Amino acid sequence: MVDTVGIVGLGLIGGSLARRLTERGVRVVAWNHRQHPYAQAEADGIFCKSTLSELMDAEPDVVVLCNPLKAMPAILAALAPLMGDHPNTTLTDVGSVKGMVRDQVKAAGLGKCYVGAHPMAGNELSGWQAADPHLYDGALWAITVDESTDYRRFLDVAAMITKDVGNRVIVVDDETHDKAAAMISHMPHVVSTALINELVANPDRNIAAALAAGCWRDMTRVSLTDPDRTRAMVEEDSLNVEALLRRMAARLTDMADQLHAGAAGEQDVMGFFAEGDPFRRYKAAVTHAGITAAQDDTATAAPQAGTTAAGFPERELAVPEAGWQQTLLFSARRGEAITGFVHPRQAIVQLRPAM
C-alpha cells in the first residue's frame, strides 16, 4: 500500500507524475534543485520541501528520482545517508537508461532498496511549466529488476504505477530494456534530427517546408525536443544507439544501391518495403483490439480478470517466490502487461496483440 510518494525533480516527467498522483488522492512530497515551481506546485496540493532531508522526514513509501541522469550520482550520494534512517522506503527512478542507473545506485550503497522504472510517456516539451497529469494517460511503464531485487519493493513500485497512476506495467531486465529503448526512442530521435538537419542544409528548404504536411510532421515531432536533452539521452545509451544507427545506415545504403540499379533492383526494392509487414499486421491488430482507445484509469479495490474498458482480455498470472523475475519477463515477451494484483502473488495481466 502506497500512501506517500516522494518526487525528486519537478520537470516534465516528475511534475506530471506529481500532479497525477495528487489528483488521484496520493500524498506527494517533492524536492527540486531550484524552487521556482514550488508556489504553483503547492497550489496543486504538492508538499514541496527545501531539502532532501525534509523530503525523507515525510516518510515516503516510494521515492521516485525524476532528475536528469547527469545529476544522478550527486542525488544518490545525498540520499544514501538519509535512506539508512528509512529502511522501508523503496527507491525508484524514471530514467530512460536502466543499466547505468543501477550501477550508480549500487555504487551509492542503495541497491537493496532500488527498483528501476521507466514510463513510456513524454513529449518534446520540458520543465514544470509543461507538466500535465494527462501525460500518463494510457501509458505503459517498464519496471526493471535483477536477481537481487526484493519482491516486496517491486510490489511497492508496481502498485504505485497500476493503482495510483492507473497505468500498465511490464517487467524486464536492464539490458533488454536499454536495447529496446534505443530501438523505439533513442535511435528515432537521431533519425528525426537527421531529417531536419537535411532540410536545413537544402537550398530549397523554404519551399520544402511550405510543402511539408502530415508525413513530415509525424517524422520530425521529436526533433523539436531540447537538443541538450536529446544529446544526453542518446549518449547515455550510446553503445546500443551506435549499433542501431550503423544497421540503419546499412539499410539505407542498400536501398540507395537498389534504386540506382533501376529495373535490376526492382525486386529488392519491393522486398525492402515488404519486410515490415509483420509490424503492419501488428499495428492493425492493436488498432482493432482497441489499444488506441482511452485506457481505463479507474483503480478498483479488488481487481479481477475479465475484459478491460479498452476491450482487451485479461487473465490471472501466478507469481512464484522462486524465479518470479523470469516469470514476469516471459509474460512481457508474450505481449502481456500487468494491470493490477488480486493479491501479492497473483497478478492480472492484459493480453495484447504480439508480433
Model-identified regions with their sequence ranges:
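NAD(P)+-binding Rossmann beta1-loop-alpha1 motif at the extreme N-terminus of oxidoreductases
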Residues: 1-54, 62
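Residues at the starts of beta-strands that form the adenosine-phosphate
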Residues: 4, 27, 88, 113, ...
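Rossmann-like NAD(P)-binding element
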Residues: 54-86, 90
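Glycine-rich, N-terminal phosphate-binding loop of Rossmann-like dinucleotide-binding domains
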Residues: 66-68, 95, 145
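Rossmann-like NAD(P)(H) cofactor-binding subdomain of soluble oxidoreductases
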Residues: 75-129
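Internal alpha-helical scaffold of NAD(P)-dependent oxidoreductase catalytic cores
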Residues: 135-224
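Interdomain hinge/lid region at the active-site interface
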Residues: 207-281
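Long, low-complexity C-terminal extensions of enzymes
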Residues: 250, 258, 262, 267-355
